[in-house]
Amino acid sequence: MTASKKILIIIGSATKNSNNQKLMEQVLEKSPHINFHMYDDLSVLPHFDTALTDADTPEEIVKIRDYIDQSAGVIISTPEYIFSIPGRLKNLLEWCVSTNVFSDKPVAFITGSASGEKGHEELLLILKTLGAVVNDKHQLLIKAIKGKFEPDGSVENNTFAKVLELVTDFEKSVSSLK
């Protein structure tokens, strides 16, 4: 069996304990065999400044770029805000434009929101612009995410099965790469 390579999970929500974060925490619980690192606080990243992209890059930006660069793949789980991706996630991606950290990097993404369609489309466009490798089977749109949680806080079975299938398949795909 191929050893599990490190996969970075980025939570795109501006809200602590968001539905997307809860969803990915449950994935972590059910997948202890997968080598994950979760980055769930985009609020610590300074606002994008083109003057600082190469020289005097802020420490937090260097750190997240290193996480991305050193990971075999990245999973982004995010809501949609006003038909777009959250500003903090867009900020992170803007900090990566002048680098090659996403070039040829396998990326999976889950958009969990009330609707999510436009944010999902926008994230795909941005990831392709960054040179990420995004496979159709490694994308999932979860509409009406609030209604996908049981009273005990767990994700309902049908939705969770789809998420787990995406994550498991993505991990196998990433682990098979040289």
Residue ranges and their predicted role:
Residues F36-H47, T99, G131-P151:
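Mobile beta-alpha loop/short-helix "lid" or hinge segments that flank ligand
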Residues M1, H120-E121, G147-E156:
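Short alpha-helix boundary/capping motifs
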Residues S4, S103-D104:
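Phosphate-coordination loops involved in phosphoryl transfer and adenosine-cofactor binding
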Residues K16, S98-V101, S115, N135:
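Amphipathic alpha-helical protein-protein interaction surfaces
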Residues M1-E80, S84-C96, S154-K178:
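N-terminal beta1-alpha1-beta2 submodule of the flavodoxin-like/Rossmannoid cofactor-binding fold
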Residues K105-A144, N158:
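Short, glycine-/small-residue-rich phosphate/pyrophosphate-handling segment
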Residues E94-T99, I126-L130:
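A glycine- and small-aliphatic-rich helix-loop capping segment at beta-alpha/alpha-beta transitions
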